[in-house]
Amino acid sequence: MYSSEFSAARLTEEVIWSFGNQAVEKLARAKTSPVVRSIAFPDGGLYVLADSQPYAQAMVVDAGPQGVGRSGHGHADALSLRLTMDGRRWLVDSGSGVYISKDPADRNTLRGTGAHNTMRVDGVDQAVADEPFSWTHIPSTQVENWIAGKSFTYFVGSHNGYARLVDPVVHRRHVLKIAGGVWLIRDIALGRTEHELEIRWHFAPDLEVRRVDSGRVEISTLGSEASGSPAQTGTAASGESGLSLIVPEETVWHTATEVTRTLLSPAYGAFQPAPLVRCHARVMLPAETATALLPRRGAIRREDERLIAPHVEQKLEPRLASVAQAAVQVYELDYHEESHGFFFALGDEAWSFGPWSSDARVLYCRIEKEKLAHLIAIGGTYVAWQGQPLLKMAGPSAFFEWREQDAVMNATPGDFSVTPLFEELTGDSRSSAANLNRNSSSYAEKH
């Protein structure tokens, strides 16, 4: 879950208080590299989605209770995210500021929803700030799904902090991490009338954030080549890693994404300016949007192409498209020679979009050089391509995953079969053996 370059210099104050100097010193001297893996801490409500490529990454989702009793030290931060990559902080918590002040705003601003990486509705907090150490209308958070596969990690959670509004609103957040690739964060607001929705992304003070166009923001370390100034000397963490934040094109969110500044509190009573990306829209509910976070290294930054359909015009930068149909919501991410499709069922019935049809709750595909290179199906019993069976599970499955580059083929439960069409689309001759290994057989002829 941590970078192999973990050192005492990068430890937070909280870790030192929790484990003590002796434990910190032992960790700094450790010769074995910590394992990078996703892990859940359900009792505390923390879910860590981790990856090791192209460098160590860990996103922490806060899905726990706001606090004990009236949540004196709690913040209104349900479903907020924090992200570390390549040994440094990227998406951060705003801190606490001060506890006691003549102006209540000094205390309430940094413990409010707007100071965290989550959704705010109608400009109000998820809970109602009372005294400096108490809240009312404290939300309840539910974790609806958690899967840590070999080539992906998936989290779904929701909270009812806005149920107190005249038109009650529920915020549901999906986080899907593709190993070695993109993060897709899907935010849904369930309600019946028009509301102002806002998602804020707070970045560490030592990062440079540039709006490249209305739908894409580039985040880089200060002094890196990506920021346009001379690169710093030292490790990749000091100059090569970067992040692209992409919102869907041709949506109200695309034109309402802005880069500004805010204040963080790295220690009690201390404040520091830091970059903030604010995405907002006034929309009729139910409504949703997605944010793609694409890690990169400056030295291997890639150009892009188009997505689900083959033979499409090349593009120079990553683009995220959003398409909604009656039964499925689709997000398409295009970059380099890769096309990434994210399909989310909107109900219990089967759906179809383009060449794909399935009863899976979530489907992900990566097409590279006109070949299927990665496939994930969460829930459901089948996946089909152009009306022909591709994959079949014996019953509703937790998930199925296949990835070409490292021979991953995995499912829970393990009773599934792939057809000859699967080999045709993937060029993977291992599919027949995979069927035999799982006491299954192909069930359709090659078309």
Regions found by a protein language model. Give the residues of each.
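Carbohydrate-active enzyme catalytic cores, enriched for enzymes
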Residues: 1-91, 148, 284, 317-423
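Extended, loop-rich substrate-binding clefts of extracytoplasmic carbohydrate-active enzymes
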Residues: 35-58, 125-178
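Short, glycine-/Ser/Thr-/acidic-enriched flexible segments
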Residues: 53-56, 65-68, 86-90, 96-99, ...
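Active-site rim segments in enzyme catalytic domains, especially the processed small/beta chain
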Residues: 72, 76-142, 148
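Acidic, contiguous internal or C-terminal segments within carbohydrate-active enzymes
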Residues: 151-211, 287-338, 398-422
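Polysaccharide-binding surfaces and accessory modules of carbohydrate-active proteins
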Residues: 194-261
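A surface-exposed beta-strand-loop module
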Residues: 269-288
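Short, low-complexity, charge-dense intrinsically disordered segments
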Residues: 424-447
